[in-house]
Amino acid sequence: MPFLDHSMGGESMQVDLDDVDDLFGDGAPLTLPSRPASKRLRQRLDNLRERGCCQTIAWSKSGTIASISPDGQQVQLRYIRANEKDATFSLSEPSPLSSWGTLPGGPLVHLTWSPVNSELAIIDAVGRLLILNFNTTLNRPTLSRRWDSDSLDDSQAIVGTYWLQNYPGPNPRMPPYTPSYAPAVKTGNSNNYHFQMTPIISTGPWHPQANKSALVSITRNGMLKLFWSQYNGKIEETTLELENSIYTDDLVTHAAVCSDRTKTLMVCMATASKQLRIVQVGLNWGTPKAEGAANAPPGNHPLNPTLSKRHLAVTSWFQPGSGDLHMDSSMSKITHIEMLPALLTSPQNKEWSPMIILTVRSFVPEQNSPYAQDTQSIIDRWELLSDQQQTVHSDIDQLGNRRNSVGSPPTNGSKLKKLDPVVVNKIVIGVNLVNFGKVLCFTYNDGSVEYRDRTTMDELHHDVNLDRIESVLDIGFSQSGEPSCLQVALSPTNFSLVQLCEDGQVKWHSIHYTLADIEAINDAQVSALVAGFTIATAQAASQGTQIDDILAVARNFANKDAFATEWVKTMVQMMKITVDYTEDTPHDHLIKNGILQMCLSITNYLGWRGDALPRQSWGKLSMIALNLRNTVIMITLSSNNITLNKTTLTPLDEPEVVNSLVGCVKWSTDLLAWLCDSLFCLFGDPKFMSLLKLPQSAPMTAYLNSQNEIALHLVLCSATRGLLSALCRRISLLDSFSTRAISWYETREKPNINNQNDPRAAAHAALYAAYQRMRRYTSSSLIKADDFDRLLTSLGADIRSAYSAALAGLEKPRSSNSQASQNQNASTQASQETIARGRQHCELGMLLLQAPPPFFVSVVDKFFNNDLKDFRANTDVAKLYFADYSLLEIDNEPQLLENRRARGIRVDLFKRVEISQKSSNTHNGTPLPWRACSRCASVMEDLAPVSTKPGISFLLRSHSNCSCGGRMAVLPQDEVKHN
């Protein structure tokens, strides 16, 4: 470029700034100096070097984001939630938590979530440990373990933690592995993908009771502490001395723990003397000897765990090289340590990859350093190798039953093999093991995120690859945060992250689609999106993880044709989810199909565009199905006996429970009335009735979709028809209960109503009044539940007959040839599987509001012209037409939706009654707070603080999740006012 024009009018002088010669004639490229590290970043690195446990932000599988305040005195709770106005997700405001008062042990320094249930361990500077349980709501925990009795001793400071994984389960038919459905490989030149299922072997040890974990912690003086839950729920402690650290150089600065395929724990400790020490720890729970998971110990058997150890290997983690001459002392200090457990690399040959120990050291140059130095992090790695097989050490040999003992003989000749280090020119602030332990995720202070293969350390997801998909990052998504970052917590799905920034703010960032403009993506890209989202959702389902941040990203593609329905179709086909309930199977099988609930939740959320906008038709069907399921569950739980503290009780003996069910009964009878009214309107529609004379069902379905009509699909689809039938029978059950309760009270208790000496009189009077309200709704219903159930039963029989006739051609004829008789059973089984797949395909399409199979047209024609016609003759059609169905929240008229929103009217998810802030119940003069679903924004009054009776408390605990599967959170009072 022209830099200086010659003053004498000659040619301008050209100066090349890309490469300026220095005094010695060497090329010296001009580069901008790296931004100096801030004071807060340097302080953060000092904290990482001083203690192994100082993670002050963490994200749970259930959705709670916990962070420690900058002053270290309280924990702040957040979660991502859907906005009721436009259905987009955002980060909630913090809910402060500081119920512990003063902190004699110094500030809070570390948070860690249990992978099994919603338990949060909070650790202070001297190692005191508090455990909170978040099973009920996202932001209001209960206390599981106090720390009042913990010692105030610096040597007890915790430098490493590890939660035991989930117990694989007592069901012998349950696979001993977690399925991973990646990669998805494109088949040929089509846009279809084949998902390769890979088994991820579960390695112990585990807590012997399902859905419970235990926390392992390593202290500065080399003590292992095991915090575990007794069968009665009390958390107890067991200890084991790993090292006798009485000298300063022997103190442990950082520690990592992982499970091993020998069903033991492996502990790696980094000491002040720059040593890495590997110790194998055996865990015996003291339970009766049992062979295999099928003979799991009973849940009420007292546990008495014992720990044993064996030292395996020692090496030095720091060996200065020539490149370290000008580095400061920080390079001789670790910031992170991780243990990567052995992985099954070849299930056929039973080959395992070795265990890997990983450490990170980071260097930040001083601003006035005379040397040309760059910011850098050095990632060191060692493999734990075995020279020869030895007999099991005596102190581990007595570990009891097979599940808790060493599964294969450990080695005495173990050694640590140093691998080549990896150097990056930025500061590592976080190391996470993801994708079932196969991938390492590094987060950096500049907000960048990097995924590397655990074995080769090659960077992953760098290039777009639509032919072989391991992660959504392969199909055009990028992940990053903002610069000036001190800590990062990845979501359990890896679809988003939260940052703790230098200014103390917590910020949420989702992955971003960068491959193409979302409005212009082609079919191949949509198919790749479906495959990537399916892999992530299936992995979340197999690990019990909430999928809210997956849905937050999917919201960007909700307007793409068939994205949501193809996503659910692929999920059902890949995970073999049952959607065919044509046969008369018990309703329990349908109700307990939790994966089907997740699929309905996906279409429910993506079909919802905010409370002031109409829902997509398939989203409306999913909403009704989810609410049906929730109501059936609530009535079932209320009707059954429960055992609490060795006492058997029936929730329906409490007036609070009956009053809560009154609204459910009203909602249920309104739903049946609305459904019949919709079907009767179709019966009176000449256009629709004429379509029943056509041989194909596509014209009929197209007309229904144009009218936003879903009633016919609700009764044709076996899953929703089964839920409707279950609801009818629950209504009849409650009608019977209320009739008997009223009769019992009027014949036995009413004469004693004025007996002031009988304390039961007032309670029985309240229960009598509640049952009268329930009976009023069941007896005045416009549609009798028993009659409608018979209508559904008749339709179900016709559908089964139609399936049998239409799919009979798929069944191979039986051969009388004696030579073929040996193949007859196999052939029959194959034919039955083919028929089952055919029905599954048809049922899945109807569940997603697509056209029924063509042979259903005759079934629908008979249903309308015979069964429904006779049913209509015995119904007051006018009352149905003019009835108020606002309780169902199903009317899609924009004006009605806006009016409802303006009045602040909502329907209580629990009691199924209309609520508003003006009409909300009060406690001590204060309106009750509301709980809201993080996924669909449904609300309910928070009755937990005022409901002390066991029956209603039991039901409220069952509503920690919304009907859509999203978690509930308590809203601040100011948010309730604007709701």
Enumerate the language-model features and the residues they cover.
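Extended alpha-helical solenoid scaffolds
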Residues: 2-979
